[in-house]
Amino acid sequence: MSVYGLQRLYIGGGYVDATSGKTFDTFDPATGELLAQVQQASAADVDRAVASAREGQREWAAMTAMQRSRILRRAVDLLRERNDELAAIETRDTGKPIGETLAVDIVTGADVIEYYAGLATAIEGLQVPLRAESFVYTRREPLGVCAGIGAWNYPIQIACWKTAPALAAGNAMVFKPSEVTPLTALKLAEIYTEAGVPAGVFNVVQGDGSVGALLTGHPDIAKVSFTGGVETGKKVMSLAGASSLKEVTMELGGKSPLIVFEDADLDRAADIAVTANFFSSGQVCTNGTRVFVHRSVKDAFTQRVLERVKRIRVGKPTDAATNFGPLVSAAQLDKVLGFIDSGKAEGAKLLAGGTRLTDGHFASGQYVAPTVFGDCRDDMKIVREEIFGPVMSILDFESEDEVIARANDTHYGLAAGVVTENLSRAHRTIHRLEAGICWINTWGESPAEMPVGGYKQSGVGRENGITTLEHYTRIKSVQVELGRYNPVF
């Protein structure tokens, strides 16, 4: 018997059975307990979801922007009222500590919906005078039906981030959560319906990558917003372009540099580094996993990091005292342990962790100890490839030019940060780093107002911020002639 029972698809404002006849299981990564059986969508189910979305989108787009704004604000209120309930589900599904999901996941998702609800009425065109008797005006119109494909690390937050600008602009969305963490997207669908979003405007289809491919290649989808790995992102872009030249937004992987200069407050720098590597058990795309420290302060910095790692409270995610939980799945655990083994084999110095935790209740979960490597080199696998787990690599440097060149020597470009008391150096360095999200003397916050996304192979487009709203609309240009028409023939 599973905790949450059979989970169905959400199409047309309510739950429906999938036609595939297939289900998949989702488990609690802390205990191995079966959480739910989830119905897998078929191609016919995806077609049904898209058709429902097309119908609902016409009704939604016909509303005034103020009407849409009010409905989205009601959804925000419902999310906040149910914060504790949703956080409990998210903790069971992801393995995140309850203190984290209560404070972050639903809260930040609701914040983004509230932000775009406020911007819905500000979607405006332009008026351009040509001459005394002629002018051009532009309209920003919704794209139509969009697809959202979520990642497993922030299930409900990502669903909110993708739906908020899409719905605010008058679009509908068919959303596929990760099959690893599929539960809370369905709760968001219930909330949107209760808030007054018309049937079909937000549909949820479940399944593996084959379902994502059906959405990406669907001729009636106008845009795909994807969060996930680089290789999958390339496939999404290829299929989206080949099928119908869809608009694409992608937030992909990272191997982000955190640079600690010799004048940094080392206590602050250590706090930042530990957060940038071990928050959410290291399963954050923006993690600052390449920690470059000036050689003159490396030992003092490393000592401070190790002191803080000892204070990390690994435990049951449902325990309020826990601030570090398991990895999301057995597959992710195996991947992370493989990277740790490669670090040892390539000569990195293991300073902390480096093992799976199996004592007591840890034995049934996917736990790995917070891990710190020193004496790392740029050519090591743990330094070059995204791990997506709690593994910090400490590297030293001598000069500003050197560290910038090394920090940029990667095909990723998602995030970067510097810690220094010299503001001129901070801005100078940040301006030279090839990354889309940057922090100075802090790490990790991504407020609704801040556009987030990557350079290079870390993504295309942005999520959050005003600029994202524009990419959920298309521009129609209209010339108006008030004077005499001069015939050509």
Swiss-Prot record:
Q: How is the cofactor bound?
A: Binds 2 potassium ions per subunit.
Task: Give the species this sequence originates from.
Answer: Burkholderia ambifaria (strain ATCC BAA-244 / DSM 16087 / CCUG 44356 / LMG 19182 / AMMD) (Burkholderia cepacia (strain AMMD))
Q: Which residues carry this modification: Cysteine sulfenic acid (-SOH)?
A: 285
Instruction: Quote the Gene3D superfamilies the UniProt record gives.
Output: Aldehyde Dehydrogenase, Chain A, domain 1, Aldehyde Dehydrogenase, Chain A, domain 2
Entry EC no(s)? 1.2.1.8
Q: What is the protein's name according to its record?
A: Betaine aldehyde dehydrogenase
Q: Which reaction does it catalyse?
A: betaine aldehyde + NAD(+) + H2O = glycine betaine + NADH + 2 H(+)
Per the record, the gene is betB
Quaternary structure?
A: Dimer of dimers.
Which sites bind K(+) 2?
245, 456, 459
Which residues are involved in binding K(+) 1? 26, 93, 180
HAMAP family membership? BADH
EC class name: oxidoreductase
- Annotated site (Seems to be a necessary countercharge to the potassium cations), which positions? 247
Q: What does this protein do?
A: Involved in the biosynthesis of the osmoprotectant glycine betaine. Catalyzes the irreversible oxidation of betaine aldehyde to the corresponding acid.
User: Where, by residue number, is the active site?
Assistant: 162, 251, 285, 463
